[in-house]
Amino acid sequence: MTKPLIGVTTYLDQARWGVWDMRAALLPAPYPRLVQESGGLATMLPPGPPDTAAELVARLDGLVVAGGADVEPVRYGAEADPRTGPPARARDAWELALIEAALASGTPLLGICRGMQLLNVARGGTLLQHLDGHVEAVGVIGRHAVKPVPGTLYASLAPELTDVPTYHHQAVDRLGRGLIPSAYAEDGTVEAVEAADAPWALGVQWHPEMGEDLRVMEGLVRAATAPA
């Protein structure tokens, strides 16, 4: 059986390697590792012209919108909190277009951390711009439990209370249209959402690529492998 092609969005940042110092498409290695170990083929999707998103998504079997910078608050009608990071406008525009194309075409979609937040914003939802105590230390992945909502797509993948790797200071506030919560943290923070009106569209607030639990990515790969 042919393995499905899973596109993973990337940073576009200044980077230095060897004798070079220039802008580069950057993707932490755990992302393609997770796709590959879950049975898929991974390809990088650096920011591009938003009007090409639908054509690109049509060539993919599945889409992963990866973690990264805070979503610019203007995207959900808010002023920036002083604790919100600098915007990545080109990436916001590109990834919102990819999400809209995936939802319109029924392409299986997984949003990770920022990717979950963008899914919510794409559907008209809003974000909490800062949560105290959700980052243990700068650059250190923490862990906490998430509880699935019975009957949801996420619960079908991980039906029990699960300890997950996490690194975020923002979260979903008002849910976007057609989205339902599918997991919560112990403090009530929404930790997963899914689109009830899409064949397979899930967002998780944590970082599955930083752990060994393949179930969420395996779910995406299975959905991307299924015949249309």
Indicate residue ranges for each PLM-predicted region.
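N-terminal beta1-alpha1 cap of cysteine-dependent amidohydrolase-like domains
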Residues: 1-112, 121, 128, 132-157, ...
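Hydrophobic, aromatic-enriched interface-forming segments
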Residues: 116-118
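Active-site-proximal beta-strand elements of phosphoester/diester hydrolases
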Residues: 202-206
